[in-house]
Each structure stands twice: as structure tokens, then as C-alpha cells.
């Protein structure tokens, strides 16, 4: 499983999503992730909207195996249900 987190500096939800990804990477052999700083990479909200296919209001925007999952709360719910994040 590969997760991509699109975030920006100073965003507490981005930090939290990245921390969850670090936890999962440490707990699971089948998990890895990449954090993409949208400011450093020059990615705009419009770029994300094209990829996701709907308006983007907030970051982080998170993909699991190239499928858009949503933001930090959506990622937490998915990881809790499917990956044992809070076990």
C-alpha cells in the first residue's frame, strides 16, 4: 500500500496525517508513503482539483494506491478501519 499526502507547511492536519503515516510505516511492512509539499513543488489547488476531479478547499489531500481518500479525518477513519492505526 502506498499513500501520497499533498500538504503545505504550517498546516496542523498535514502534520497529523504525516504522523499517522509514520506510525503505520513503523507498524506495517506493507505500508509506505510520500509527503508532497505543494508549495515547494509548485502545485496549485487547481492542479489538485484536476487530479481529484472536484473542488479542493483544504489540505491535506490524500491518495491511497492512487485512489483519492480525502483529508486527514478521512485518512484516520480509513486507517483505523482497515490498517489498525489506533490498535
UniProtKB/Swiss-Prot annotation:
Taxonomic superkingdom: Bacteria
GO MF terms held by the record: electron transfer activity; glutathione disulfide oxidoreductase activity; protein-disulfide reductase activity
The protein's matches in InterPro entries, at most eight in alphabetical order, are given as: Glutaredoxin (IPR002109), Glutaredoxin_subgr (IPR014025), GRXA (IPR011902), Thioredoxin-like_sf (IPR036249)
Question: Listed GO cellular component terms?
Answer: cytoplasm
Keyword ATP-binding, does the record have it? no
Q: Which Gene3D superfamilies match?
A: Glutaredoxin
Q: What subcellular compartments does it reside in?
A: Cytoplasm
Q: Name one GO biological process term.
A: cell redox homeostasis
* Residue span(s) of domain Glutaredoxin: 1-87
Q: Does the keyword Membrane apply?
A: no
* Disulphide bridges, residue numbers: 11-14
Alphabetically sorted, this entry's keywords are: Cytoplasm, Disulfide bond, Electron transport, Redox-active center, Transport
Q: How does it assemble?
A: Monomer.
Q: What does this protein do?
A: Has a glutathione-disulfide oxidoreductase activity in the presence of NADPH and glutathione reductase. Reduces low molecular weight disulfides and proteins.
Tell me which family the UniProt entry assigns to this protein: Belongs to the glutaredoxin family.
Q: What is this protein called?
A: Glutaredoxin
UniProt lists the gene as grx
Amino acid at each position: 500500500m502506498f499513500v501520497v499526502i499533498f500538504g503545505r507547511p504550517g498546516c496542523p492536519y498535514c502534520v497529523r496525517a504525516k504522523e499517522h503515516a509514520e506510525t503505520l510505516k513503523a507498524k506495517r511492512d506493507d505500508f509506505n508513503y510520500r509527503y508532497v509539499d505543494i508549495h515547494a513543488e509548485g502545485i496549485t489547488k487547481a492542479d489538485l482539483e484536476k487530479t481529484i476531479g472536484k473542488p479542493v478547499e483544504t489540505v491535506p489531500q490524500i491518495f491511497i494506491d492512487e485512489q483519492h481518500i480525502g483529508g486527514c479525518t478521512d485518512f484516520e477513519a480509513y486507517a483505523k478501519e482497515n490498517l489498525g492505526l489506533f490498535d
